Amino acid sequence: MKLEGVIAATVTPFTKDGVNYEGLRIILSRIVEAGYHGVFPTSSTGEVTKLTPEERVKVMEVAKEVAGGKALVIAGTGTGDHLSTIDMVRRYKDVGVDVVLITPPYYIQYDWAAIYAFYKKVLDKTDVPVILYTIPLATGYNIPVEVFELVANEYSQVVGVKDSSGDFRYHLDLIYLLGRRLSVLQGLDMLFVPSLIMGAHGGILAGPNFLGKTTLEQYRLVKEGKTAEAVSLHNKLMPLWRFMGGCGLVGKLGGKWPTLYKLATQLVHGIDMGPPREPLPPVEDKDRKELEKILKELGLI
């Protein structure tokens, strides 16, 4: 399996009592109808670590139904130990997802040997296609490229790696060393176009929640060799990504993330995102006003 294109890491709307599954269905339907190559609801953007295992399964059941074979359905484990990870992979397999993204161990900063041992224990019990993942903003460490290389060489079910490090030198290493064997996928919207130009296969991104077909257009332009046009579109969106970064997305995970993505989705599409799931705080009024200003300047609202 070769993963290519734009996979939407979707936001999760809530009610005061739980997940707003009807709202989720609307979000997923818009993305599938727009022509995105895949959906990834139980993601960091989708607040996977704040969902119960039962909620994660139901979210993926909705995604599987909405996708209807028109888009890949990818599930994220959101777990930090091998036993819980194996359990979530089993549950997702029963749902019939296409690919599972393995959340790396978090809370403790692990060394190479511990990370490698974690992957071996999980993959020895896993036969579904798997994406490996690095997100040092959440785990406190970046997974060495060599660890991914070792794991990919040992386990044929590993089909890709998602990079949310924000470290472009590291990303280039992934493309150079693993790009012939695995699909290298960018995890930050701000770096999507530069990554594609340098040989990445696609991205797992939050922008599709509220950007319409813009992210797909970026992908198309690069693939057609229209690099200057892709860069121009990228630069047009930079005020948005710089604002998102300034509010905690890049550099550290601030308390305003991913609520800004949810607010943007609500402002653009009119879908009630409901309250953030605690302990995430609501977006402050000053940030809401700034986001509204940027979205208006982009012609999105």
UniProtKB/Swiss-Prot annotation:
Xref: InterPro entries: Aldolase_TIM, DapA-like
GO MF assignments: 2-dehydro-3-deoxy-phosphogluconate aldolase activity; 4-hydroxy-tetrahydrodipicolinate synthase activity
Enzyme Commission number(s): 4.-.-.-
GO CC field: cytoplasm
Record-annotated active site: S44 (charge relay system), Y107 (charge relay system), Y133 (proton donor), K162 (schiff-base intermediate with substrate)
Pfam families in the cross-refs: DHDPS (PF00701)
The keyword rRNA processing appears for this protein: no
Locations listed in the record: Cytoplasm
Protein family per UniProt: Belongs to the DapA family.
UniProt-recorded name of the protein: Uncharacterized DapA-like lyase Pars_0992
Organism: Pyrobaculum arsenaticum (strain DSM 13514 / JCM 11321 / PZ6)
